[in-house]
């Protein structure tokens, strides 16, 4: 990176990319009607005026539109990506050029990634709100508080975890800060009004902390808004999965045996995508309900111990760990392709490949590696087991991200304006806001909504203007 791409207020790949980024941001705005409508609705009131917001979310063109929406509503912002491969460098440069501190470039090391997350949180008086994706900013604060409390009790700097490489990096960073300021994270947590979390994996973390009484501030589960999970997770993945695989490999998908591991909303989108391309699609599942859904859609539901021997393309969608193991990959056919579209790189045992000296790693191009076994067999691993759609392509289309990000903005407004209503628990946005997000996107698609009569509304026992479904309705 050139020196002009690093300053106290930003770290990006190349500030010379800013104008390119600006042109793409303008294009994306035309496809993000929800965010643009929110800007117009709140233009005069600035409902986030004075709010200090930290973002830990993929630094893409679509995220740039989110950032500028939050800024137009009055917020101060600092931003980092939530994945080492997901940043679009021209988007980061365009945002840095506006004066918003942003710390992100495609291909960060893990040490840089956590340092940039730390920088995004480093307001002089601390952040008041967090926009999180995967929960890493939230994790850093909670783990920091935990270590500060341990230090206060024992007088000893806590040992660095060796459970995995990434946690070791996090703990080393926290220990350095501990020796500078032993109450840094506790002060930050006290000043936080809440977090809005974007994705399934991060939401799981939040509910786990809330159940254990460990959550330090209120949280909004944006992921489970219907206009997020049933659109971003399904329709977004249905398009961006194929985009990532195609850009990475140029492989013909028609006729291939494609195995989708997991059949939640993300898995459903991936299975539909492969089916639409003419692939022979199989699904693995642990949940009998999801397995039955897959079977009723015409997909073969199989066991991975068998599928690993004949599949051509594998994608993990579960949010779990060790879904594709080293033993699975040992028996895969020559030239099989392995990738992940869950948030973290834990679904595929990639370290068992990259750390094995008996295997040879051939980098075809960035984020595309062929792993060669001693007998000459090769499999292709995309994005080193991280998000294939963002590591090997540019993520979901702008329109579907407008759904998700409009929910994020509404959650941030709610936390900022009504923080006294919320305890240290996990909340979801009310149904009427979910329906509002959907309404904001209808005209862009030429949708004409039917309006019920008063008689019809009375018959169903719902308001004419909604909400139309009970909270437990599954869509």
UniProtKB/Swiss-Prot annotation:
NAD(+) binds at residues 199-201, 233, 262-267, 285, 320, 341-343, 389. Binds 1 NAD(+) per subunit. Pfam families: AdoHcyase, AdoHcyase_NAD. Keywords: Cytoplasm, Hydrolase, NAD, One-carbon metabolism. GO terms for cellular component: cytosol. Its EC number is 3.13.2.1. CDD domains: SAHH. The keyword Phosphoprotein does not apply. Substrate binds at residues 60, 133, 198, 228, 232. One of its GO terms (biological process) is one-carbon metabolic process. Pathway: Amino-acid biosynthesis; L-homocysteine biosynthesis; L-homocysteine from S-adenosyl-L-homocysteine: step 1/1. GO terms for molecular function: adenosylhomocysteinase activity. It catalyses: S-adenosyl-L-homocysteine + H2O = L-homocysteine + adenosine. Its cofactor is NAD(+). May play a key role in the regulation of the intracellular concentration of adenosylhomocysteine. The keyword Hydrolase applies. NCBIfam families: ahcY, PRK05476.2-3. It is found in: Cytoplasm. Belongs to the adenosylhomocysteinase family. It is an enzyme of class 3 (hydrolase). This is Adenosylhomocysteinase.
């Amino acid at each position: 990176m050139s020196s002009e791409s690093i300053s106290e207020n930003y770290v990006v790949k190349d500030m010379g990319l800013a104008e390119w980024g600006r042109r793409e941001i303008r294009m994306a705005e035309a496809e993000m009607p929800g965010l643009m409508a929110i800007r117009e609705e709140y233009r005069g009131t600035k409902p986030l005026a004075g709010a200090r917001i930290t973002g830990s979310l993929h630094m893409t063109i679509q995220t740039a539109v989110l950032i500028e929406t939050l800024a137009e509503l009055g917020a101060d912002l600092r931003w980092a990506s939530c994945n080492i491969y997901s940043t679009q460098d021209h988007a980061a440069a365009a945002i840095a050029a506006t004066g918003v501190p942003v710390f992100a470039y495609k291909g960060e090391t893990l040490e840089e990634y956590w340092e940039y997350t730390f920088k995004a949180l480093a307001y002089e008086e601390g952040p008041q709100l967090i926009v999180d994706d995967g929960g890493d900013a939230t994790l850093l604060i909670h783990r920091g508080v935990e270590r500060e409390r341990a230090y206060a009790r024992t007088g000893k700097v806590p040992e660095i975890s060796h459970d995995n490489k990434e946690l070791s990096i996090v703990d080393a960073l926290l220990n350095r800060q501990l020796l500078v300021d032993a109450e840094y994270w506790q002060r930050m947590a006290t000043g936080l009004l809440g977090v809005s979390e974007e994705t399934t994996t991060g939401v799981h973390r939040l509910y786990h902390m809330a159940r254990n009484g460990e959550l330090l501030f209120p949280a909004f589960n944006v992921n489970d808004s219907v206009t997020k999970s049933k659109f971003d997770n399904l329709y977004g993945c249905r398009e961006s999965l194929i985009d990532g695989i195609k850009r990475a490999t140029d492989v013909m998908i028609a006729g291939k045996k494609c195995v989708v591991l997991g059949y939640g909303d993300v898995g459903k989108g991936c299975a539909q995508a492969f089916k639409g391309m003419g692939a022979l699609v199989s699904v693995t599942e642990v949940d009998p309900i999801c397995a039955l859904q897959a079977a009723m859609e015409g997909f073969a539901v199989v066991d991975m111990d068998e599928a690993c021997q004949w599949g051509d393309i594998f994608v993990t969608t579960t949010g779990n760990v060790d879904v594709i193991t080293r033993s699975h990959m040992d028996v895969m056919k020559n030239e099989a392709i392995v990738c992940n579209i869950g948030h973290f790189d834990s679904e595929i045992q990639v370290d068992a490949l990259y750390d094995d000296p008996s295997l040879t790693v051939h980098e075809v191009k960035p984020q595309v590696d062929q792993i060669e076994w001693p007998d000459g067999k090769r499999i292709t691993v995309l994005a080193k087991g991280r998000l294939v759609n963002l590591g090997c392509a540019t993520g979901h289309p702008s329109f579907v991200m407008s759904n998700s990000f409009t929910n994020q903005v509404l959650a941030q407004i709610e936390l900022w304006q009504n923080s006294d209503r919320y305890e240290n628990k996990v909340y979801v946005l009310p149904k009427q806001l979910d329906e509002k997000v959907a309404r904001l996107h209808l005209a862009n698609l030429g949708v004409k909504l039917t309006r019920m009569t008063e008689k019809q509304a009375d018959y169903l026992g719902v308001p004419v203007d909604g909400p139309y479904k009970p909270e437990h309705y599954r869509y």
